[in-house]
């Protein structure tokens, strides 16, 4: 199946900009990754270029020549990130590459609490072409949670139909804001700055863990990322 992908790591040692804002009794630290340059990137089985896409500076993540139709993914890990609880927000734009098979959806998403170079990770991702489909069942599968290594999307769908995926309006190729709030074993996914989450997970499969943060896309996706922040 196309979504049972072999995730290929692409290391992204991005420039880290840290700002601190003070509240009445606590401090909130924000780490910003502009994702606007290829400088300092270590690439594995992928290519990355810095471009301007739909009015934003961004990185374009894609497969190596000859791998455009493979059932693989490129993952970009944010070097130096160590995340347990908090908020991750990033701008993404994804759509199937021209000529991709009709059952491909433009898979694109965020990994968090990443360990062992992606062997373990929590994952929220989008299926952009499902968001405005005329097929209601496809619309219900617009966003997805999964967890590596033991809980891929198809196992979760079989064992708990409708629990780990949901509908949200998505426009393929358009900039989309993904925000994930994580606390302990719970996580919430928000799209395009909505006040309410489109997907709630109350039992993250890796438990109350920690690890790195990454962005990823399927080899058949035209994928763009910009302005990632961690709070």
Model segments located where?
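Bacterial N-terminal signal peptides that target proteins for export
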Residues: 1-10
């Amino acid at each position: 199946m196309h979504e049972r992908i072999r995730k290929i790591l692409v290391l992204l040692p991005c420039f880290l900009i840290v700002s601190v804002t003070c509240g009445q009794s606590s401090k909130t630290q924000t780490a910003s990754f502009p994702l606007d340059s290829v400088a300092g990137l270590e690439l594995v089985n992928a290519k990355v270029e810095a471009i301007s896409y739909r009015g934003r500076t961004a990185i374009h993540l894609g497969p190596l020549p000859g791998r455009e139709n493979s059932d693989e993914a490129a993952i970009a890990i944010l070097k130096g990130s160590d995340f347990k609880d908090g908020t991750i927000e990033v701008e993404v734009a994804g759509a199937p590459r021209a000529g991709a098979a009709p059952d491909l959806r433009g898979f694109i998403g965020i990994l968090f609490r990443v360990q062992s170079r992606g062997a373990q990770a929590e994952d929220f991702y989008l299926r952009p072409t499902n968001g405005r489909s005329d097929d209601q069942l496809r619309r219900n599968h617009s966003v997805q949670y999964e967890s590596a290594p033991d809980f891929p999307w198809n196992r979760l769908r079989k064992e708990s139909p409708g629990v780990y995926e949901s509908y949200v309006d998505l426009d393929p190729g358009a900039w989309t804001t993904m925000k994930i709030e994580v606390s302990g074993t719970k996580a919430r996914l928000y799209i395009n700055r909505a006040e309410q989450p489109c997907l709630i997970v109350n039992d993250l499969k890796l438990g109350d863990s920690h690890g790195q943060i990454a962005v990823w896309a399927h080899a058949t996706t035209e994928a763009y990322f910009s302005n990632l922040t961690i709070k």
